[in-house]
Amino acid sequence: MNAYVQQNQPPGVPPLELTGERTLPDVPTENYWYRRHLAVYEWIAARAAGARVLDMACGEGYGSAVLARSAAQVIGVDGNPEAHEHARLKYTRPGLSFEWGAVETYGEPGSFDVVVFLQTIEHVTDPSAVLRHFRSLLAPGGVTYVSTPNVLTLAPPGAAKSDNPWHLREYRAEEFTALCESAFAHVQMLGLFHAGKLRAHEIALRLGWDRLHAGLRITKPFYGWFTPAISTRDFTLRAAPLTHALDFVALCA
């Protein structure tokens, strides 16, 4: 069994393989990153009841499916044909559809109440233009949600970015805020942080847990249990301070 390929997919749905470009559900070793992304989707879904939602760069489609639990209509858009086909086959419910397209050009002006663009702004060559395009897609009173990793917690100390080859640029809080404000009149910035088991794990590491489990030779079995047990309850969103946030989530209007 390939540890980097999705397990137990529905009949007729081709599994996707991890490439580092996007996270996936149903890959036990990837569960931390999947839940970290999913936590933000769930938070947005709770605020999108009855809305017309556009989920840009939806990838595997799991986030679009979460949004569709509360929204009136969700369209998930991705430019990767393999991911698009997987999402279209796997996630079927009334009000949910998937389209193949480019985030820079998809959509008609004023067509959506909510635009979602998570963990992708760091991948695009002209982020300001993309955000201006999203602004044009919003109906009056609409909101765009954009998230990106915090370079200060993702990259090595002092580095301009992490070693993720898919990331063209990574942002500090003030840089990401300025980027969003270049396209939107109103921007509220939140940070995603560890909570629950992950917060306890952070504290344990500061007390030397990494040396202890290495010395006891239980690293592999411990994380073989711990990583699959992580849930979205092990993350929380709050406004400040943002220096140590895992990810930034911008609410733009």
Language model features: what each stretch is:
Residues Q119-H123:
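A short His-aromatic
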Residues M1-G110, V114-L118, S128-L131, W166, ...:
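Conserved N-terminal segment of class I S-adenosyl-L-methionine
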Residues V146-R169:
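Short, glycine-/aromatic-enriched active-site segment of Class I SAM-dependent methyltransferases
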Residues L67, F134, C180:
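Class I S-adenosylmethionine-dependent transferase superfamily signal
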Residues L168-A183:
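Short alpha-helix
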